Amino acid sequence: MSMADRDGVIWYDGELVQWRDATTHVLTHTLHYGMGVFEGVRAYDTPQGTAIFRLQAHTDRLFDSAHIMNMQIPYSRDEINEATRAAVRENNLESAYIRPMVFYGSEGMGLRASGLKVHVIIAAWSWGAYMGEEALQQGIKVRTSSFTRHHVNISMTRAKSNGAYINSMLALQEAISGGADEAMMLDPEGYVAEGSGENIFIIKDGVIYTPEVTACLNGITRNTILTLAAEHGFKLVEKRITRDEVYIADEAFFTGTAAEVTPIREVDGRKIGAGRRGPVTEKLQKAYFDLVSGKTEAHAEWRTLVK
């Protein structure tokens, strides 16, 4: 089933449109130049009902991204929150992946963005583990990419922008063609930045390390894991991380809304730790899934019921 050929509805500029009718013109500006921003959000089945995890944080980042790109979203944050709930609710989804996107219309061509209408869509559909259930249990193989992560002054790394993900796609395609599952990207100075679409953590001697958010996205799942790790008593250090530090780590894992908490078992042919999901990773992974699925009362404010 293609993404275009599905039953259901998509929130499109304030209206719930039939899925197959949610189309736009081939001369839409963002399709040609990549100037747009988006989010990846998840909803989970909880004992209280379907709940969107950290909805407000995602909506805030969407607006921050648009502001960085100088795009004016024609709706309030509350309206986008309610539209996100509606996209899940009206598709009768117990759990879902949600894609809000802000993009320019087809009022003109060329690099000047003046006079272009800003559109907003929000789609929601069922989507399981990003790299498969086995990856969550056994971990994945990672390859260091030959493609450098963006310099902070090239693509505005605090914005989750459409065009920036060309860099991610090139890195991921290279990794997969080389027999890996995911890429590890370095910043312009050669330090570890992130995966193609995930933040990275390593554990060494019981201390959890993660790169500073300079060349990587300030991930919402990353921030969630930092909170959970602190609550579990782990020492946390945000710093520059070298490639060889990853090689000799006891454990490593990726985080992201799509990837959730995915262990890394191998990097560049080198086994990480015991070559499987480590105990710290497993503990944080369980804490994360307990949190998003409402098995704990902690951080109830991060779970927004759709009904």
From Swiss-Prot:
The modification N6-(pyridoxal phosphate)lysine is found at residue 160. It catalyses: L-leucine + 2-oxoglutarate = 4-methyl-2-oxopentanoate + L-glutamate; L-isoleucine + 2-oxoglutarate = (S)-3-methyl-2-oxopentanoate + L-glutamate; L-valine + 2-oxoglutarate = 3-methyl-2-oxobutanoate + L-glutamate. This is Branched-chain-amino-acid aminotransferase. Pathway: Amino-acid biosynthesis; L-isoleucine biosynthesis; L-isoleucine from 2-oxobutanoate: step 4/4; Amino-acid biosynthesis; L-leucine biosynthesis; L-leucine from 3-methyl-2-oxobutanoate: step 4/4; Amino-acid biosynthesis; L-valine biosynthesis; L-valine from pyruvate: step 4/4. Acts on leucine, isoleucine and valine. One of its GO terms (molecular function) is branched-chain-amino-acid transaminase activity. Belongs to the class-IV pyridoxal-phosphate-dependent aminotransferase family. GO terms for cellular component: cytosol.
